[in-house]
UniProtKB/Swiss-Prot annotation:
GO terms for biological process: 'de novo' pyrimidine nucleobase biosynthetic process; 'de novo' UMP biosynthetic process; amino acid metabolic process. It comes from Streptococcus uberis (strain ATCC BAA-854 / 0140J). This is Aspartate carbamoyltransferase catalytic subunit. Heterododecamer (2C3:3R2) of six catalytic PyrB chains organized as two trimers (C3), and six regulatory PyrI chains organized as three dimers (R2). Catalyzes the condensation of carbamoyl phosphate and aspartate to form carbamoyl aspartate and inorganic phosphate, the committed step in the de novo pyrimidine nucleotide biosynthesis pathway. Carbamoyl phosphate binds at residues 59-60, 109, 139, 142, 265-266. InterPro entries: Asp/Orn_carbamoyltranf_P-bd, Asp/Orn_carbamoylTrfase, Asp/Orn_carbamoylTrfase_sf, Asp_carbamoyltransf, Asp_carbamoyltransf_Asp/Orn-bd.
Length: 309
């Protein structure tokens, strides 16, 4: 859906691929306005939202909840441990139920890639779907907060050298970011173990060893090692990973003074990044968490715009 009167209008948010550049820039701009506290909040108390997380989450779940409460929405609690999911209820039937009860927005995280396809195509489900992460597929709200953090720092994307490093093949963060960052004009590089890289990345950027290019980077985006998706197949120890692929203190010193470090968290300290660097001067990991609330407020507003259009 379009941008109308400088307001993004969305029915759902499920994939970065479905957003135009104008919508992306509109959402991160709106997030910045919310952060600056100069945007009046409409009375949204007649709207209901629910967060349905079928995978573990701290940042995404709780920042959506914070955003929902900042936006004045009524939050309907949902706990997978006490729901009919444990009786065999399907995801589709769970969302169908929430929609029938009058929930306007369902924020969903689920291990199945593209789980949302049947939900957004169903004429029986009237709730808007916000994808909080679908397996190793997409993570649009994380991508938008990453973009907001980068834009805050540099004021543009064109020409920035950005390396996405780590567990690439299992990362929905990598896949969401590489698509839109390339579209916005950034130079993308990938790094990490060969076994966690695939040819699908070649269309978006070049594979390089981290030590070959670290002194040229504007942004080093580290990825979490996703142990839960490996089935015990990693062929190296935590210490070996940190030495060969992680951000060590020695590598940190090679970064440009203006470079920034990002990580979607949770962080495996002394694996992806040295413990001493998580809150270092060039790190923006805490800023990413903070920006997550504001960009998710912008997402919710855009969905509400779509529901009232």
């Amino acid at each position: 859906m379009p941008v109308i009167n400088n307001q993004v209008v969305l029915k759902h948010l499920v994939s970065m691929e479905l957003l135009t550049n104008e919508e992306v820039l509109g959402l991160i701009s709106r997030g910045s306005e919310f952060k600056a506290k100069n945007v009046p909040i409409a009375n949204n108390s007649h709207y209901f939202t629910s967060n349905l997380f079928f995978e573990n989450s701290t940042r995404t779940h709780k920042s959506f909840e914070m955003a929902e409460r900042h936006m004045g929405l009524q939050v309907v609690e949902f706990n997978t441990d006490t729901s009919s999911v444990n009786k065999g209820e399907t995801l589709y039937d769970t969302i169908l139920t929430m929609s029938a009860l009058g929930v306007d927005i369902c924020v969903v995280r689920h291990p199945e890639v593209d789980y949302y396809q049947s939900l957004i195509k169903s004429p029986s489900i009237t709730a808007s779907i916000v994808n909080g992460g679908d397996g190793s597929g997409q993570h649009p709200s994380q991508c938008l907060l990453d973009l907001m953090t980068i834009y805050e720092e540099f004021g543009h994307f064109e020409g920035l050298k950005i390396m996405i490093a780590g567990d690439l093949v299992h990362s929905r963060v990598a896949k969401s970011n590489m698509q839109i960052l390339k579209r916005l004009g950034a130079e993308i590089y990938f790094s990490g173990p060969d076994e966690w890289y695939s040819k699908e990345f070649e269309a978006y950027g070049e594979y390089r060893k981290i030590d070959d290019i670290i002194d040229q980077l504007d942004v080093l985006m580290l990825l979490r090692v996703q142990h839960e998706r490996h089935n015990g197949s990693a062929g190296f120890s935590k210490e070996e990973y940190h030495k060969n692929f992680g951000l060590t203190e020695e590598r940190y010193e090679k970064l440009k003074d203006t470079a920034i470090i990002m990580h979607p968290a949770p962080v495996n300290r002394n694996a992806e990044i040295a413990d001493s660097l998580v809150e270092a001067k060039k790190a923006r990991i805490v800023a990413q968490m903070e920006n997550g609330v504001y960009v998710r407020m912008a997402i919710l507003e855009a969905i509400l715009n779509g529901r009232s259009a």
